[in-house]
């Protein structure tokens, strides 16, 4: 079943987080995308400087609090389906959804935990 949705429903955020020592800019790509149920979806997050594996991936649906999917770059949060996976370290990170399900249509974003305001 082809279940196309507006790109903004699977939108991505470009986030910038000020750091205590210096500013770390997080850039996601693509900025938005359109996908169908069953598709393999890959989202990339790049840090302006190395953050080791201090990165989490989050899913947010309208009117709901963010849900953490991945912590420490590649560790699956308890209760999160195994179709979600994370990889990377240093400056480049990837979130992959191996087979997109209807409930996966949401906004996804990365958050670095290496440096805080």
Curated annotation (Swiss-Prot):
Record's superkingdom? Eukaryota
- Tell me where in or outside the cell this protein is found: Secreted; Cell membrane
**Predominant location category:** secreted
Task: Describe the subunit structure.
Answer: Immunoglobulins are composed of two identical heavy chains and two identical light chains; disulfide-linked.
Assigned keywords, A-Z: Adaptive immunity, Cell membrane, Disulfide bond, Immunity, Immunoglobulin, Immunoglobulin domain, Membrane, Secreted, Signal
Kindly give the Gene3D superfamilies that the UniProt entry links to this protein.
Immunoglobulins
The record's function comment reads: V region of the variable domain of immunoglobulin light chains that participates in the antigen recognition. Immunoglobulins, also known as antibodies, are membrane-bound or secreted glycoproteins produced by B lymphocytes. In the recognition phase of humoral immunity, the membrane-bound immunoglobulins serve as receptors which, upon binding of a specific antigen, trigger the clonal expansion and differentiation of B lymphocytes into immunoglobulins-secreting plasma cells.
Where in this protein does the record put region Complementarity-determining-1? 46-56
Q: Which organism is it from?
A: Homo sapiens (Human)
Give the Ig-like domain ranges. Answer: 24-117
State the encoding gene. IGKV1-17
Q: Which CDD domains match?
A: IgV_L_kappa (cd04980)
Name the Gene Ontology biological process terms: adaptive immune response; immune response
Q: Map out region (Framework-2) in residue numbers.
A: 57-71
Disulphide bridges, residue numbers: 45-110
Positions of the UniProt region annotated as Framework-1 = 23-45
**Any one of the GO CC terms:** immunoglobulin complex
User: Can you name this protein?
Assistant: Immunoglobulin kappa variable 1-17
Q: Where is this region: Complementarity-determining-3?
A: 111-117
* Region called Framework-3, residue ranges: 79-110
Q: Where is this region: Complementarity-determining-2?
A: 72-78
Q: Where is the signal peptide?
A: 1-22
Pfam families with a match to the protein in the record: V-set
Family matches, as SMART domains: IG, IGv
């Amino acid at each position: 079943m082809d279940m196309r949705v507006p790109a903004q429903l699977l939108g991505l955020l470009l986030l910038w987080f000020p750091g205590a020592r210096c500013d770390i800019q997080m850039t996601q790509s693509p900025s938005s995308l359109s996908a169908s149920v069953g598709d393999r979806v890959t989202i990339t997050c790049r840090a302006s400087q190395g953050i080791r594996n201090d990165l989490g991936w989050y899913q947010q649906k309208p009117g709901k609090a963010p849900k953490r999917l991945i912590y420490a770059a590649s560790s699956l949060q308890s209760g999160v389906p195994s179709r979600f996976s994370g990889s990377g370290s240093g400056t480049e990170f990837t979130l992959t959804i191996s087979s997109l399900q209807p409930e996966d249509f949401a906004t996804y974003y990365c958050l670095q935990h290496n440096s805080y305001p």
